[in-house]
Swiss-Prot record:
Ranges of biased composition (kind: Gly residues): 115-124, 521-536
Keyword Acetylation: no
Leader sequence residues: 1-22
Species per Swiss-Prot/TrEMBL record: Homo sapiens
Disulfide partners: none
Highest taxon above the source species: Eukaryota
Keyword tags: Signal
Region Disordered: start-end pairs: 111-134, 306-336, 500-536
Protein name: Glycine-rich extracellular protein 1
Keyword Signal attached: yes
């Protein structure tokens, strides 16, 4: 701006009346004229002005003179035309003037956009090269920057490679996709009004994929197998809006049609879990936004290959969201043969009885302090298999209870721990024939328990019939036992402990006191009330 302001000011100064009339007014008398007229036509001082340096001219309608008018500083070299110099190429006066006086016409660029050569309205000089664009002459259009070669506007024009509005230049071969004629290389896709390429600001599609919204087949290719939209029948293969392509092969494992049975067993009865948005006429592919399926099982339940909306691909052998069953177990329809459904006998592990001591609890023997069973012929009795409630494998030597009274087998009711072999429980459940290894006493045939079923049962051992010097057969058996705990327990038994009168054929042992019949005690054997063995 500074370079152009100084010539403009000089031009305005030179247009004053004094300059147009031949220079400055006459000097007062007494002042000599040294070099000639002061009108700018001669060389020298005029009116006390310093002499000008040669080579400078006044350029606004004046002749070429080596001085300045009105005390102005000389111009720098290189601007406009010099005195006697030929026309400078590429520079004009910039104000519509054709040429300077004396100097010849200025040669330079051809006319641009209706302007003469030079600057148009304070703009910078144009660079040569651009061709005519959009009906304009080469150069600037208003304040717009020059266009790059090869690009043209595409709004309202034929589809040509270049800009569309404010968009970046398209790659060759792509159309604008907004009703303009399509470019060669790609044909129209998906029965849309768009040409191949970009639609609006959308990126161009890759070859081979369609919109899948009731679109036609791909150009140059037949119907793509295993691809579909899934939103209605008759949908052509392709991609659903914003969806990834399907991988072929996987069927919808939703329990319809032939396929997996219950618990992943082929051929079994089918359950039909509810799967959202799975219709019988849906074509293969995704419903909604789903990941691609992995190839695998064939189509099931009348559907084509694909998966339900929001569901991950199923693994072979699964139905819906059910996990595969382990071998031997069924699913929701009763147990299959296995160790926990009472169809297979549980595993029996024999164990040895552990010695114990009498308990202070009522009944003679508690649940945690039972002595081992008696020894027969120097051997332990064989264990008997049994199970209790809960269907867990039972320990060897127990059987489930089957009732009360006579004939009750060893074991307990539900919730009770099993008894160790060799003793009764003392609650009236077990009778004289409790243990298979114990033999009835002579004279105790058909014994069926105690009176009121709440007494303490006398131990029944094979050697119980042997007479003891103290007159107590049970104490003698305990003293002669091989177990120290039984010997100590037998020593505490008092004479006169016999079976009560509930035994029909009961009679006193030889050498012992008579049995007291009709006693008020629960045992009817001389003991009144409940009394543990040897502790009354």
């Amino acid at each position: 701006m500074g370079a152009w302001a100084f010539p403009a000011a000089l031009f305005l100064l030179c247009l004053t009346s004094e300059s147009l009339q031949g220079g400055l007014p006459l000097l007062p008398p007494g002042l000599g004229k040294v070099y000639g007229p002061h009108s700018g036509l001669g060389a020298g001082y005029d009116g006390g002005v310093k002499p000008q340096k040669p080579g400078f001219v006044v350029r606004h309608g004046l002749g070429t003179q080596p001085d300045t008018e009105g005390g102005m500083k000389p111009q720098n070299l290189g601007f406009r035309t010099f005195a006697g110099a030929a026309a400078q190429p590429g520079y004009g006066n910039g104000l519509g003037a054709a040429a300077f006086p004396v100097a010849g016409a200025q040669s330079g660029p051809a006319a641009q956009n209706g302007f003469g050569p030079g600057f148009g309205g304070g703009g910078k000089p144009q660079k040569p090269g651009p061709t005519t664009q959009n009906g304009y002459r080469p150069g600037y259009v208003g304040a717009v920057k020059p266009q790059k070669p090869g690009f043209q506007y595409r709004i309202g024009l034929g589809a040509q490679p270049g800009f569309r509005g404010d968009m970046k230049a398209q790659e060759p071969g792509l159309g604008n996709g907004n009703g303009l004629s399509a470019q060669p290389v790609l044909t129209a896709q998906n029965r849309f009004g768009f040409g191949a390429g970009l639609g609006g600001n959308v990126k161009p599609l890759k070859p081979g994929y369609g919109k899948r919204l009731r679109a036609g087949a791909f150009p140059g290719a037949g119907t793509q197998p295993e691809y579909g939209h899934g939103n209605g029948p008759g949908v052509q293969p392709g991609l659903g809006a914003g969806m990834k392509p399907q991988m072929p092969g996987l069927g919808a494992p939703n329990g319809y049609g032939p396929g997996r049975g219950r618990a992943g067993v082929p051929g079994g009865p089918e359950r039909r879990p509810w799967v959202p948005h799975l219709l019988p006429f849906s074509s293969p592919g995704y419903l909604g936004v789903m990941k691609a399926q992995k190839p695998g099982p064939l189509a099931q339940n009348g559907y084509r290959a694909g998966a339900g909306e929001g569901m991950k691909p199923q693994k072979p052998g699964l139905r819906g969201t059910l996990k595969p069953q382990k071998s031997g177990h069924g699913h929701e329809n009763g147990p299959w043969p296995g160790p926990c459904n009472a169809r297979v006998a549980p595993m029996l592990l024999p164990r040895l009885p552990t010695p114990g001591v009498p308990s202070d609890k009522e009944g003679g023997w508690g649940l945690k302090s039972q002595p081992p069973s008696a020894v027969q012929n120097g051997k332990l009795p064989a264990p008997m298999p049994a199970i209790q409630w809960g269907l867990k494998p039972q320990k060897a030597g127990h059987q489930p209870p089957n009732g009360y009274g006579p004939g009750a087998e060893p074991g307990f009711n539900g919730g009770l721990e099993p008894q160790k072999i060799g003793l009764g429980y003392g609650n009236g459940v077990l009778g004289a024939r409790v243990f298979p290894e114990a033999h009835p006493q002579p004279g105790f045939h058909g014994a069926n328990g105690f009176r009121n079923r709440d007494g303490v049962e006398a131990l029944v051992y094979p050697k119980a019939a042997a007479l003891a010097p103290e007159g107590n057969g049970q104490a003698g058996v305990l003293w002669n036992s091989r177990w120290p705990t039984l010997q100590a327990w037998g020593a505490g038994l008092k004479p006169g402990y016999q079976a009560g009168d509930e035994y029909a054929e009961a009679r006193s042992q030889p050498g012992g006191p008579d049995v007291k019949r009709g006693s008020n005690g629960q045992l009817g054997n001389g003991y009144g009330g409940r009394c543990p063995l040897g502790k009354c």
